[in-house]
């Protein structure tokens, strides 16, 4: 792992443990995951829709709202490099620059407002994949990103429903997307996306 603190040193972990430092001082992984799940679920229910105009600061605000009870660094961009399997996420030193550039592109596309469903799915898959590769936070990027795009979809007249999406298929689609093939991700989003108010 490379970071600004020295090779192999992860300041987010308790010394000698593979456990994230947390405000609850929990040092058992399963207990920490359960506490995080419960607390973020409560916080997620209180997050307001937010403005149409959104950028990296808005994504950081969502993360801070979700994880403020658990991590002191909630809402702060990560300062170490992280991986999922063999797939590296964006080098930490480039997150802010790349994230702002990506959000600028999203703004220039009008935050995907006014697109027909097929085009919305195509562009949503692109931006979702790009922000996933960015993975701006040490943990919790996925949940913050999901809420960010749920809000974006609502502003664009759509809604996202994640029910029935298998974790393995989702992870594989994101890995393929990181390698430049968005086909599987687009197929998943074609099922996830529906017009706002549309009943199943």
Curated annotation (Swiss-Prot):
What residue range is the signal peptide? none
The record ties this protein, via Gene3D superfamilies, to:
Fido-like domain
Could you say which residues bind ATP here? 84-85, 140-142, 146, 172
Which molecular function term from Gene Ontology is one that the record holds? AMPylase activity
Key words of the record? ATP-binding, Nucleotide-binding, Nucleotidyltransferase, Transferase
Q: Which InterPro entries match?
A: Fido, Fido-like_dom_sf
The catalysed reaction is: L-tyrosyl-[protein] + ATP = O-(5'-adenylyl)-L-tyrosyl-[protein] + diphosphate; L-threonyl-[protein] + ATP = 3-O-(5'-adenylyl)-L-threonyl-[protein] + diphosphate
SUPFAM superfamilies in the cross-refs: Fic-like (SSF140931)
Instruction: Specify the Fido domain's residue ranges.
Output: 54-195
Q: Which GO terms describe its biological process?
A: regulation of cell division
Class of enzymatic activity (EC top level): transferase
What's the EC number here?
2.7.7.108
Question: What does this chain do?
Answer: Probable adenylyltransferase that mediates the addition of adenosine 5'-monophosphate (AMP) to specific residues of target proteins. Involved in cell filamentation induced by cyclic AMP. May have some role in cell division.
| Entry's family note | Belongs to the fic family.
Name the record gives this protein: Probable protein adenylyltransferase Fic
What species does this protein belong to?
A: Escherichia coli (strain K12)
């Amino acid at each position: 792992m490379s970071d600004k603190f020295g090779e192999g040193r992860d300041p987010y972990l308790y010394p000698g443990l593979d456990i994230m430092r947390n405000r609850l001082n929990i040092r058992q992984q399963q207990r920490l995951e359960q506490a995080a799940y419960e607390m973020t679920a409560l916080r997620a229910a209180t997050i307001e829709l937010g403005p149409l105009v959104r950028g990296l600061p808005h994504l950081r605000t969502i993360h801070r709202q979700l994880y403020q009870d658990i991590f002191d660094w909630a809402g702060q961009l990560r300062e170490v490099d992280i991986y999922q399997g063999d797939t590296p996420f964006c080098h930490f030193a480039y997150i802010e620059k790349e994230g702002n550039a990506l959000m600028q592109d999203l703004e220039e596309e009008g935050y995907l407002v006014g697109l027909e469903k097929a085009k919305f799915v195509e562009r949503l898959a692109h931006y979702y994949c790009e922000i996933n590769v960015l993975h701006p936070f040490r943990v919790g990027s996925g949940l913050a990103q999901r809420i960010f795009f749920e809000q974006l979809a609502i502003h664009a007249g759509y809604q996202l429903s994640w029910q029935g999406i298998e974790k393995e298929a989702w992870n594989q689609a994101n890995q393929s997307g990181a390698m430049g093939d968005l086909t599987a991700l687009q197929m998943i989003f074609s099922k996830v996306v529906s017009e706002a108010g549309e009943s199943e």
